[in-house]
Every structure is written in structure tokens, then in C-alpha cells.
Amino acid sequence: MQPALAPAPHPSMQTSAQDHADQVLHDSLLAAQHLSQHPQQPRPQQPNAQPHHLQPTATTSPRDQNNIDPAISGGAMLPPSQPPAQPEPTVEDETPKTYGKRPLSTSKRAAQNRAAQRAFRQRKESYIRKLEEQVKEYEVMSQEYKALQAENYQLREYVINLQSRLLDSQGEVPELPGNIDLNQPRTEISVPQPAPRPGQAGASAPPQGSPQSQVSIANDDMNSLNRIAEAGLGMRKHPNEEAFLSNNFQARRGRGDETADPSETKTEPPTHGLPMVS
């Protein structure tokens, strides 16, 4: 007994099925081309179930499906190949990187700020202590300078006293400073001459030159002493200088009187009448 043959499909039904398969193939090619051009963009996964247009319609009979060309129907009926799942990017810190370095978190930044402030305070305190020590050193130096200045004044007074005593004890005159000129004329002191005795006027006439010479010598001595006093650079006068000068003048005057007395006082010849033996 031979099996019954299936009736041949209608030509219009074959044409519609072929058009539908061509459309499905064209869509799959477009999708593959789109994936090749944009591989990085993730494509939403398609459900395993076939799309509505791939499922056989209720009106299509099993015989129509069997009559479709296997080369076309095989690729059309199979679901399109799924693209490989791309690995999900690892989740990094929420803060973006700037200039190749990751910015610090708020806590780390606050800790660094506190450390910087602490170091600044320490430097400021050390600098203040250093300045205080320098101020103390300057105060000590000022006190020492004042003490040295007072000692210098005392030593200057002492040197002036020594110079005045040297001038009194020795006749050496120190070197004349450049700002003092001793060539200026000075008024000479007039010394009163003693009045001659009435009984000895004739006898005292010849030796009158000796007291005048002594007076001129005294004047010269006083002038030289005045010059020495001018050369003392403002040195204080010795308290006994005037007394010394007056005593010296009186002594010289007394010596002049003594030299004049022997010539003035002559012994009268005796009245006994005998000749005198010289």
C-alpha cells in the first residue's frame, strides 16, 4: 500500500513565505553590521523566545513550512547569534582623577592641613624664642657699652690729671696740637717796681738793671707757663698753680733784692783815725 502524497502548496503561499524569510535575513544582516561598527556599545540581550514575526503563524500549515527552501528557512528560523557579553567595568572611586593623580579624600586632606598648621606653629614659636634671646643679648650689650663708656670717661679724666702733674713736675712741653697757634700776641703782665729808699737813692742807682732783668725773666717764665697751659688740650688747671706761680715770682723777687742789698749797704769807715787794711 503506497502512502498518500501531500497536496502541492499554492504558489502564492510560497512567495509570501520566501519574502518573509528574505526580510528576516536582511534584518539579521543589518544587526550584525551594526554590531561590527559599534562593538563597545552593549546591546540589550534579546529574549530566548523567538520574535513574533519569526514564530509560525497560525494560518501557516506544517506543509507550507516543509516546502520552504532549507537554505533560506534554516538561517531564518534560527535565532540570531548573541554577541559576547562584555565584562562590566570595575567600579572605582567616585571621585574622578585629575592630571593623572587621584584627589585625596576629605579626611586625608584635613589631616594634612592639621599637620601643616602644627608645623607652622612650631616654626613660629621657635622663631619668637630666637628673637627674644637676641633681644636679651642686645640688652646685655647695651649695658656693657654704657659701662665701657663710663670707664672711658674716667680714664680720660685720669689721663688729664697725670698730664697736669707731669707738666708741674717736669719742664718738658708735649707736642703742640695742630689746631692751636701760640704765635698770637699776648698782653704782658705789668709788675710794679719797688720804690727806692730815700737815704740810698744814690747808692742804688748803678745796680738798677738787676731787678728789671729779674722782672723780665719772671715775665718770660709766666708767658712760657701760659703757653704750656694752652698746650694742655683743655686740661684742668692744677689747683696750686696760681700759688706756685706767685711763690715763684716772690722767690725770684726776693733773690733779686738779696743780690741788690750788698751793693746798696756799704759799711761806713770807722772814726778811730787808723788806716784800713784792704
From Swiss-Prot:
GO terms for cellular component: RNA polymerase II transcription regulator complex. Disulfide bonds: none annotated. Residues 1-121, 173-278 are annotated as: Disordered. Residues 103-166 form the bZIP domain. Residues 1-10 have a biased composition (Pro residues). It is found in: Nucleus. Residues 104-127 are annotated as: Basic motif. Gene3D superfamilies: 1.20.5.170. It holds the Pfam family bZIP_1. One of its GO terms (molecular function) is transcription cis-regulatory region binding. Keywords: DNA-binding, Nucleus, Transcription, Transcription regulation. Residues 254-269 have a biased composition (Basic and acidic residues). Residues 131-162 are annotated as: Leucine-zipper. Residues 109-119, 198-214 have a biased composition (Low complexity). Residues 56-68, 215-226 have a biased composition (Polar residues). InterPro entries: AP-1-like, bZIP, bZIP_sf. Putative transcription factor. Belongs to the bZIP family. PANTHER family: TRANSCRIPTION FACTOR KAPC-RELATED. This is Putative transcription factor kapC. The gene is kapC.
